[in-house]
């Protein structure tokens, strides 16, 4: 899964004092046919809505739909490698799938820290994902920071 961002992986853990409410980060991910097929194999989801163009068109979709849970898989990588400091443990993730997305779409992830507890090292993050300027996903996560390796 090739998450595209300008910065490299976090090599050094962030100091908890640098993780502030309002801190935002953006990432993008292209949903390639290869990534789509890898997720199909991994998940075992062979539903025709994701894999049969005739079925999709009959149901008024222009193309095969992307797998919604590919978004949460990308979030797992973002939390574990990039943001807010890498090496986080996801304690909770809410998911609201608002609109479909398709193979070859580029998903734009915007994450914003909305709560930080420096004592417990727990942060809350709101996430919004867009494709072609449409919101396709929003959610809320609670992460336990594990800032030291």
List each language-model region with its residue ranges.
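Hot-dog-fold acyl-thioester-processing enzymes
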Residues: 2-88
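Mid-chain, well-packed structural core segment of small domains
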Residues: 81-105, 109
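HotDog/MaoC-like acyl-thioester-processing domains
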Residues: 1-24, 28, 101-149
